[in-house]
Amino acid sequence: MRYLPLTEADRRAMLDVIGAKSVDDLFRDVPPSARLAGPLPLPSHQGEMEVERAFTRMAGKNLSAGCAPFFIGAGVYRHHVPAAVDQLLLRGEFLTAYTPYQPEVSQGTLQMLFEFQSQVATITGMDVANASMYDGATACAEAAIMACRITKRNRVIVSGGVHPHYAETLETSLRFTEMEADVLPPDPLGMEDMIGRVDSKTACVVVQNPGFFGTVRDLRPLAALCHEAGALLVVMVAEPTSLGLIESPGAMGADIVVCEGQSLGMGLNFGGPGLGLFATRDKYVRQMPGRLVGQTADVDGRRGWVLTLSTREQHIRREKATSNICTNSGLCALAFSIHLTMLGGTGFGRLAELNHLAATRLEQKLRAVKGLRVLPQSYYNEFAVHLGDDADAAAVVDALADKGILAGVPASRFYPTWPELKPVLILAATETNTEDDMDRLVAGLQEVL
């Protein structure tokens, strides 16, 4: 296929249609400081060996998660991923992100997605799940939009315990619609009260459990409050391994459950890729976005799998589709499914226990640090700590990084305009953390505080 570039007349005609004066107008939302004004300053051409050495030197400046005590979480978590997961992903029949439109030649992929859906529905306590979304943030936004369609209301209340990136993505998705997001202030103590906020105009309440600051809460009272007002409860789960220990959102009354699936099957990859999980009640299935794989039988009575309820989707009814998300995170869904299958039900529960035990052990050790206090009263594998009124959590993190310790995420990174959160540090502990890791963190905190 030949590449035919646009002429200046072509560009001018396209810009006129959208009302832009120049190509630069298309990038006006990008801050000038982030734009490249001239050619990229690359060195002269080099051989493969020289380039490899240069990149190796650059990589040597990084402090790898596997080479240091690692307590960073805040939405992405370090877990052990069995080597078999990546090996199975490399099989030719799976190594694609393409949607299997032709069931007669895609039974393996369709069966995998069907089993993935079944696993997601089981761990979330819901009736039905789709074949994945892009990531947890987009799944959260799509859930809010779905709730507005179902209730025919426009107001979305977002708990202060929801990850700020999820809240920002939700706000972006609603910005040019009639829907509005009411994002509550950050809630490090898990004490916010929804009474008086949920009313007849509320489409849904979006809450994260465990929360961004680590709080685990009983969602039943909130579910009852929402349902009494005719609103839906959307539950976001950023750490899906918690579902092996905490009662499922479905059992606590959630109407829609969305998750970030990165913890199972995927490692830490500079922020991606992620995996969005999306589950709901049977009665809302026709309003659910994303692909849906169903089980059927062919003319000979043999069991098979097909894409079902496809009239909800943009490739069938573009202008009336529930979402524009289509081909998305199928390979990541397979990684999630393989990892969860290898664990099994008992192993999944045991993994969750190990994570909670690691966090509990870390909390006990942190009691030796003068002036430090743990904020959540209940948590899973992550909690926020207050380092003292005069402490700067960001400076503490930098000081410990210089000592070879990756000591969590300062809350001020996400809330720079909230001075009361400057001393707050978010720490995560998983099955990968050792006693020595925890002792080094405690010793480091005692030294720098």
Curated annotation (Swiss-Prot):
<dbReference type="InterPro" id="IPR015422">
    <property type="entry name" value="PyrdxlP-dep_Trfase_small"/>
</dbReference>
<dbReference type="Pfam" id="PF02347">
    <property type="entry name" value="GDC-P"/>
</dbReference>
<dbReference type="GO" id="GO:0009116">
    <property type="term" value="P:nucleoside metabolic process"/>
</dbReference>
<dbReference type="InterPro" id="IPR023010">
    <property type="entry name" value="GcvPA"/>
</dbReference>
<comment type="function">
    <text>The glycine cleavage system catalyzes the degradation of glycine. The P protein binds the alpha-amino group of glycine through its pyridoxal phosphate cofactor; CO(2) is released and the remaining methylamine moiety is then transferred to the lipoamide cofactor of the H protein.</text>
</comment>
<dbReference type="GO" id="GO:0004375">
    <property type="term" value="F:glycine dehydrogenase (decarboxylating) activity"/>
</dbReference>
<dbReference type="InterPro" id="IPR015421">
    <property type="entry name" value="PyrdxlP-dep_Trfase_major"/>
</dbReference>
<dbReference type="InterPro" id="IPR020581">
    <property type="entry name" value="GDC_P"/>
</dbReference>
<comment type="similarity">
    <text>Belongs to the GcvP family. N-terminal subunit subfamily.</text>
</comment>
<protein>
    <recommendedName>
        <fullName>Probable glycine dehydrogenase (decarboxylating) subunit 1</fullName>
        <ecNumber>1.4.4.2</ecNumber>
    </recommendedName>
</protein>
<dbReference type="GO" id="GO:0019464">
    <property type="term" value="P:glycine decarboxylation via glycine cleavage system"/>
</dbReference>
<keyword id="KW-0560">Oxidoreductase</keyword>
<dbReference type="InterPro" id="IPR015424">
    <property type="entry name" value="PyrdxlP-dep_Trfase"/>
</dbReference>
<comment type="subunit">
    <text>The glycine cleavage system is composed of four proteins: P, T, L and H. In this organism, the P 'protein' is a heterodimer of two subunits.</text>
</comment>
<dbReference type="InterPro" id="IPR049315">
    <property type="entry name" value="GDC-P_N"/>
</dbReference>
